[in-house]
Curated annotation (Swiss-Prot):
Family: Belongs to the UPF0339 family. Duplicated subfamily.
Keyword Transcription regulation carried by entry: no
Entries under PANTHER family matching the protein: PTHR40606, UPF0339 PROTEIN YEGP
InterPro entries: DUF1508 (IPR010879), UPF0339_domain (IPR051141), YegP-like_sf (IPR036913)
Keywords recorded for this protein, A-Z: Repeat
Swiss-Prot/TrEMBL Sequence repeat ranges: 10-58, 61-109
Gene3D superfamilies assigned: 2.30.29.80
Any single Pfam family the record assigns to this protein: DUF1508
Organism: Shewanella oneidensis (strain ATCC 700550 / JCM 31522 / CIP 106686 / LMG 19005 / NCIMB 14063 / MR-1)
Name of this protein: UPF0339 protein SO_3888
Length: 110
């Protein structure tokens, strides 16, 4: 089963999306958007940029946990991963976003 996007509305009336793998695990989380159209544009940007390996910035948090950001061509962060236990796990997360990010399935929970 391939992945999907879930679009949701936060308690302060802002919008965000997550990308889920086929097993239902969240593999990428967006920033908050003030409008639904901004979040939809963010999903479109992930669909465009997720197959491009150069768009992934491999990072390490202050607690030494590896994670990654997916960036657009203008270097703006589109989405952020979870914190991983190892760099190998992070790299597998990137592969999962590269594979699942192209999906056109969007579950609108707003």
């Amino acid at each position: 089963m391939s992945g999907w996007y879930e679009l949701s509305k936060s308690s302060n009336d802002q919008f965000k999306f997550v990308l889920k793998a086929g097993n239902g695990e969240v593999i990428l989380t967006s920033e908050l958007y003030t409008g639904k159209s901004g979040a939809m544009n963010g999903i479109e940007s992930v669909q465009t940029n997720s197959p491009i390996e150069a768009r992934y910035a491999k990072e390490v948090a202050k607690n030494d946990k590896p994670y990654f950001n997916l960036k657009a061509a203008n270097h703006q962060i589109i989405g952020t991963s979870q914190m991983y236990s190892s760099t190998a796990a992070r790299d597998n997360g990137i592969k999962s976003v590269m594979e699942n990010g192209k999906t056109t399935t969007i579950k609108d929970l707003t």
